Regions:
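Short gly/ser/thr-rich secondary-structure transition/capping motifs
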Residues: 99-104
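Ferredoxin-type iron-sulfur electron-transfer modules in oxidoreductases and energy-metabolism complexes
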Residues: 5-10, 138-141, 145, 163-164, ...
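Cofactor-cradling patches in redox/metallo enzymes
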Residues: 89-91, 105-189
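Short acidic/polar capping segments at secondary-structure boundaries
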Residues: 15, 35-39, 81-82, 151, ...
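Iron-sulfur cluster-binding cysteine motifs and their immediate structural context
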Residues: 1-41, 46
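N-terminal, charge-rich interaction modules
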Residues: 50-97
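Short low-complexity, flexible loop/linker segments enriched in glycine and/or proline
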Residues: 46-47, 161
Length: 201
């Protein structure tokens, strides 16, 4: 997994583990901030180039039916596709008394039959590929897909593992990319609110 390229110089947040080792080694070239607004409707927008000050969300890439249909209430089914539970714990925290994302009508549900979309965490192992596919097809149309965490965005540390099967992401459109190891609750909340047009960026 290579999050950094040298020619041209870029940093791919979808592959980044946020260990900050690169910033320690090259403090004049790389600087991490506390800005949690790093989600995007475009995978390409997660690639940071020299001079970039923030990650662009690109609302024009959001399917127009998403804010129209899910702006008042959004029910999500979370699938841990071989994740390490770090992103899953942060997603759980998004509904606690500190963040209270449920006040906007966004909640996690136990069954894909009751969901409007799926939130994928983990690198998507071969053992979870079929289960994820079944979950996706169990969600009624129209539906959306959110990938959450660097493992889900790129495979993370396991991107070159033979135990990973990421064909799902080639078959279905991803509506929201949320990097992070793990993804902060505010990153998740901000990304979903932008996707649903619940706030002005």
């Amino acid at each position: 997994m290579k999050a950094i390229t040298s020619a041209p110089f870029t940093l791919a947040l979808g592959k980044c583990l946020f260990c900050r080792e690169c910033a320690l080694r090259a403090p004049k070239n790389i600087r991490f901030t506390n800005d949690y607004r790093i989600g995007s409707a475009s995978r390409e927008a997660l690639v940071i180039k020299p001079g970039d000050e923030k990650v662009e969300f690109h609302p024009e890439l959001v399917r127009p039916e998403i804010p129209k249909l899910f702006g008042q209430a959004l029910k999500l089914r979370q699938v841990s596709a071989a994740g390490d539970a770090s992103v899953e714990m942060e997603l759980n925290a998004s509904g606690n008394v500190n963040f209270d994302f449920g006040r906007y009508g966004v909640e996690f549900v136990a069954s894909p039959r009751h969901a409007d979309g799926v939130v994928i965490t983990g690198p998507i192992s071969k053992n979870m590929a079929e289960a994820l596919d079944i979950c996706y097809h169990s969600i009624p149309e129209p539906k959306l897909v959110i990938v959450c965490g660097s493992e889900a965005c790129s495979g993370g540390l396991f991107s070159e593992s033979k135990a990973v099967n990421r064909e799902f992401l080639n078959k279905y459109k991803v509506d929201l990319w949320l990097p992070g190891t793990p993804t902060h609750p505010m990153t998740f909340i901000d990304g979903v609110m932008n996707m649903l047009s619940l706030k002005k960026r």
